[in-house]
């Protein structure tokens, strides 16, 4: 009685045990995680209980039987003669599955599944098939050998032979493209040349010997992957499609390269409009580099600034100012007869003269955090020379082109033109003549 009670205790709570397993795994189909051996044992135990106690088989055991039968049908469907009509990817997957087979069902499900025999790597290294002819393993052995790279001591020779074959094909392709008497590559041919496995005929003309050799080589190589009834298209009516790869790359580079042309830019030269007012401004220090300006601004309060000549030839003036407890510098740029600290940004304030630009940045509320603060000018401690003062007065009364009309020597004219800027007027494009 104790043994019967222990057996009943082990068998009776089977349904409740499955529910608790469902609760642990968190989803209903957790029972499918069990191995095939446990499923078959549970099925046999349920049949024994049904014969002794006349109890119906639970719905869960029926679902497991259906799942086993469906898997059996799927495996039967994937094996056997159906293996021959599948795609290359599916064939490779099935071949790998044969090397690492799926666990077989025990009991009544085992006869319908393939055998556990594996194809080892040592067997794949053999030159001859070690399996009986026309067997399933022999078919898979030949299939893997056809679609894998041979790993042998003579692999270098195989690679060199393959490279020589590729060079020969490239030479044949280049020779075929240069021959204009081939109808397949002419512009007048309107129909493609089609070659089948049984016949080689071109509707637009004949095929040369090199083309036939290329077709036979391709048909021999492709016979492993494609059936004999498939049609191989050799050429089309478009010459552009049959161009070699290097010619197409040259055409793409020519299309992508920008056109070559020369440009002629016309400038107008203008004198600084307010050079006299700048010289009269006490914050203008004339010619000075940034290191001398930093020495003058050292220890000065926030907003102290000075105006000086820029050290770069492309710019006329620069400001050195004190902000964020350090000495900073900003160039004054010119664009379209307007002066600003950033000529490429239309949102930045610009002025037609230098003095108006300095007046704008005196107000701290008008200055952004990245803009110079020019609230307190640093007074110049020396006077300018009489020569410089005379230049400012003359430039205030004439123009850049008007200086050439003045009855003065040429060196003096160059001296008067020193403070000027260039403004772009127009851009002329001069195309390069085509080389004949």
From Swiss-Prot:
Signal peptide: none annotated. GO terms for biological process: intracellular signal transduction; negative regulation of epidermal growth factor-activated receptor activity; positive regulation of proteasomal ubiquitin-dependent protein catabolic process; protein ubiquitination. InterPro entries: SH2, SH2_dom_sf, SOCS4/SOCS5_dom, SOCS4_SH2, SOCS4_SOCS, SOCS_box, SOCS_box-like_dom_sf. It comes from the Eukaryota. Residues 9-25 have a biased composition (Basic and acidic residues). Gene3D superfamilies: SH2 domain. Residues 373-422 form the SOCS box domain. Pathway: Protein modification; protein ubiquitination. One of its GO terms (cellular component) is cytosol. Residues 1-25 are annotated as: Disordered. SOCS family proteins form part of a classical negative feedback system that regulates cytokine signal transduction. Substrate-recognition component of a SCF-like ECS (Elongin BC-CUL2/5-SOCS-box protein) E3 ubiquitin-protein ligase complex which mediates the ubiquitination and subsequent proteasomal degradation of target proteins. Inhibits EGF signaling by mediating the degradation of the Tyr-phosphorylated EGF receptor/EGFR. This is Suppressor of cytokine signaling 4. It comes from Mus musculus (Mouse). The lineage of its organism: Eukaryota, Metazoa, Chordata, Craniata, Vertebrata. The gene is Socs4.
């Amino acid at each position: 009685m104790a043994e019967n009670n222990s057996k009943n205790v082990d068998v009776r709570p089977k349904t409740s045990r499955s529910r608790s397993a469902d609760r642990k795994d968190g989803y209903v189909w957790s029972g499918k995680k069990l191995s095939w051996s446990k499923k078959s044992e549970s099925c046999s135990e349920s049949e024994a209980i049904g014969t002794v106690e006349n109890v119906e088989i639970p719905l869960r055991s029926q679902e497991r039987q259906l799942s086993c039968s469906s898997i059996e049908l799927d495996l039967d469907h994937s094996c056997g003669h159906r293996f021959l009509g599948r795609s290359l990817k599916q064939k490779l997957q099935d071949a790998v599955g044969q090397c690492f087979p799926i666990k077989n069902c025990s009991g009544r499900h085992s006869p319908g599944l393939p055998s556990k025999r594996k194809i080892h790597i040592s067997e794949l290294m053999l030159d001859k098939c070690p399996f009986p002819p026309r067997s399933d393993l022999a078919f898979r052995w030949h299939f893997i050998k056809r679609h894998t790279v041979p790993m042998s001591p003579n692999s270098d020779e195989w690679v060199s032979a393959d490279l020589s074959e590729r060079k020969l094909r490239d030479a044949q392709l280049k020779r075929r493209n240069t021959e204009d008497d081939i109808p397949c590559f002419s512009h007048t041919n309107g129909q493609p040349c089609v070659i089948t496995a049984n016949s080689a005929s071109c509707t637009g003309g004949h095929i040369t010997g090199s083309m036939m050799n290329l077709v036979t080589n391709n048909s021999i190589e492709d016979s492993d992957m494609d059936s004999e009834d498939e049609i191989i298209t050799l050429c089309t009516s478009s010459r552009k499609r049959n161009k070699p790869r290097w010619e197409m790359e040259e055409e793409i580079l020519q299309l992508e390269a920008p056109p070559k042309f020369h440009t002629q830019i016309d400038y107008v030269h203008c004198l600084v409009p307010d050079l006299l007012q700048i010289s009269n401004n006490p914050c203008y220090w004339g010619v000075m580099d940034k290191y001398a300006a930093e020495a003058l601004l050292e220890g000065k309060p926030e907003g102290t600034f000075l105006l000086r000549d820029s050290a770069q030839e492309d710019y006329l003036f620069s400001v050195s100012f004190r902000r964020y407890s350090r000495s900073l510098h900003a160039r004054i740029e010119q664009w379209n007869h307007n002066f600003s600290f950033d000529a490429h940004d239309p949102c930045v304030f610009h002025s037609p003269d230098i003095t108006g630009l300095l007046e704008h940045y005196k107000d701290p509320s008008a200055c952004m955090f990245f803009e110079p603060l020019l609230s307190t000018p640093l007074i110049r401690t020396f006077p300018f020379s009489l020569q410089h003062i005379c230049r400012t007065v003359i430039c205030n009364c004439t123009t850049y082109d008007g200086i050439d009309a003045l009855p003065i020597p040429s060196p003096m004219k160059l001296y008067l033109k020193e403070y000027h800027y260039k403004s772009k007027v127009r851009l002329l494009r001069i195309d390069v003549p085509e080389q004949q």
